[in-house]
């Protein structure tokens, strides 16, 4: 398994552009859900890499972390000419980074991907470590692989759009990690 670069930044445009430039690719795709399309794409819209990027938008919430949505992402990649040398940027919470990472890891036997988590929970858990997957047959993360992203970019700017529930979910995950240190 390759090493994963985790970058904590405060300038998402510059750092994402740098992470993208470090990857060799022929086509660039950005996976978002309905929420991140509305709230987060405006933060990177003016970046130079966006002129070449193709956006793939999926439904928000964990109910969409399933085989149908995965097949939709694969179909979008295929229909838009993605190759084994394409790059997928997953911009969103844990559902987007899990599903997008799994889609990238299995499309054409694996294409490179970058995770840009936009929720605190995804920043401290889902997007880091190479866990990818989908829910199946009523079970959470039932199908998946370990396949680390080329880079994970964590920018606190995205936290400004979160409601209290999403912040508390992230804090709870942080406390869980902290409690494991003392076992």
Identify the residue ranges that each predicted region occupies.
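ATP/NTP phosphate-donor binding region
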Residues: 1-87, 176
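Short, basic, helix/turn surface patches
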Residues: 81-89, 140-146
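Acidic-aromatic/histidine active-site loop/patch
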Residues: 94
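Catalytic nucleophile loop
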Residues: 97
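A glycine/threonine-rich phosphate-anchoring loop and its flanking beta-alpha core
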Residues: 102-181
């Amino acid at each position: 398994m390759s090493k994963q670069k985790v970058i904590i930044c405060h300038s998402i445009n510059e750092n994402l552009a740098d992470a993208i430039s470090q990857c060799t690719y022929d086509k660039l795709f950005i996976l978002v859900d309905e929420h991140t399309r509305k709230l987060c794409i405006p933060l990177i819209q003016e970046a130079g890499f966006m002129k070449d990027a193709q956006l793939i938008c999926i439904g928000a919430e964990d109910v969409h972390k399933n085989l149908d949505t995965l097949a939709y992402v694969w179909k979008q990649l295929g229909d838009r000419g993605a190759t084994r040398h394409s790059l997928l940027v997953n911009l969103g919470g844990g559902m987007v980074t899990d599903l997008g990472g799994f889609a990238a890891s299995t499309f054409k036997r694996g294409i490179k991907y970058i995770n840009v988590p936009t929720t605190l929970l995804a920043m401290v858990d889902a997007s880091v470590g190479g866990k990818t997957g989908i829910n199946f047959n009523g079970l959470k993360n039932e199908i998946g692989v370990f396949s680390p992203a080329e880079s994970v970019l964590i920018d606190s700017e995205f936290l400004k759009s979160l409601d209290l529930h999403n912040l508390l979910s992230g804090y709870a995950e942080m406390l869980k990690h902290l409690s494991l240190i003392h076992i």
